[in-house]
Regions:
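Conserved NAD+-utilizing ADP-ribose enzyme module
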Residues: 1-97, 102-122, 126-212
Length: 212
C-alpha cells in the first residue's frame, strides 16, 4: 500500500524546490507535466497511478497542489525556492495578518524583519490558530508576530493570496509587527480577543468617518 503522506512530502520537495530530483522540468508558472511526475513516482514507489496523485491533491490538508485546467500539469501553489510566476494579482489584505515562529529565530527576525529566506515570499496567516499551528512545527517556545498589514498596504507593499489561502508578501520590516508569546491556551485566546477588538475598532472607526 502506498504511503500517501510520504509521497506527498516528496512531491512538495520536487515541485517547490528540486524538480530535478524527479527528472522534471517546470515552466515559468511552476507547472510540471503530470504524466512525467506519475511515471517517476511509479518507478520510485511502485504501482503509483494518476488516481493516486488525484487522491493526494484532493486530500492534502494544506491544499498545497493544483492542476491546470485540463489536468495535464501540476504545481505547488506557493512555497517555491526558485522564481515562479503564480499569476496572482495584488489584493487588499485584512487589517492584521499573523506569522507563527519559534523563539529560537527571534534574534534574527528582530534584526532583519520577517524575510523569505529560501522561499519566494514571506508566508502570513489570516488567523491566529493557523499561525500558532505553523509556529508549533518549529519547536521551542511559540511566538506569533502580529503584522499590521493595513499599514504596509498603505505604504506600498503588495500582498497576494495563494490558492490555498496563504497571504504572500516580499518582506515584513520590524516596524510593522509586534511579538506575542503563546505558551498557553490562555495566551492564545487572549491574542484572539485583542486581534478581534483591533478589527472591530477600525471597522467602527471607518464607518463613523464615512457618516461624518
Amino acid at each position: 500500500m502506498i504511503d500517501y503522506e510520504r509521497v506527498s512530502k516528496f512531491i512538495s520537495l520536487v515541485l517547490r524546490h528540486k524538480p530535478e530530483a524527479a527528472n522534471l522540468t517546470v515552466d515559468k508558472y511552476g507547472y510540471a507535466q503530470v504524466d512525467e511526475l506519475v511515471a517517476y513516482l511509479n518507478k520510485k514507489y511502485g504501482g503509483f497511478t494518476v488516481t493516486d496523485l488525484d487522491t493526494i491533491v484532493e486530500t492534502d490538508d494544506k491544499q498545497r497542489y493544483s492542476y491546470n485546467n485540463d489536468h495535464t500539469k501540476i504545481r505547488a501553489v506557493q512555497g517555491h525556492s526558485f522564481p515562479v510566476d503564480l499569476g496572482l494579482e495584488a489584493q487588499q489584505p485584512p487589517l492584521l495578518l499573523f506569522h507563527g515562529t519559534s523563539t529560537k529565530y527571534l534574534d534574527s527576525i528582530m534584526e532583519k524583519g520577517i524575510i523569505s529566506k529560501s522561499r519566494q515570499y514571506v508566508h502570513l496567516s489570516k488567523d491566529v490558530d493557523t499561525a500558532h499551528t505553523v509556529g508549533l512545527r518549529h519547536g521551542g517556545g511559540t511566538v506569533i508576530l502580529v503584522v499590521n498589514a493595513e499599514q504596509m498596504r498603505k505604504d506600498g507593499y503588495k500582498f497576494f493570496l495563494s490558492d490555498n489561502g496563504v497571504w504572500l508578501v516580499d518582506e515584513v520590516p520590524t516596524k510593522y509587527f509586534t511579538l506575542y508569546h503563546c505558551n498557553t491556551g490562555f495566551d492564545l485566546n487572549l491574542l484572539k480577543v485583542i486581534a478581534g477588538e483591533y478589527d472591530d475598532f477600525f471597522v467602527h472607526h471607518e464607518r463613523t468617518e464615512g457618516q461624518s
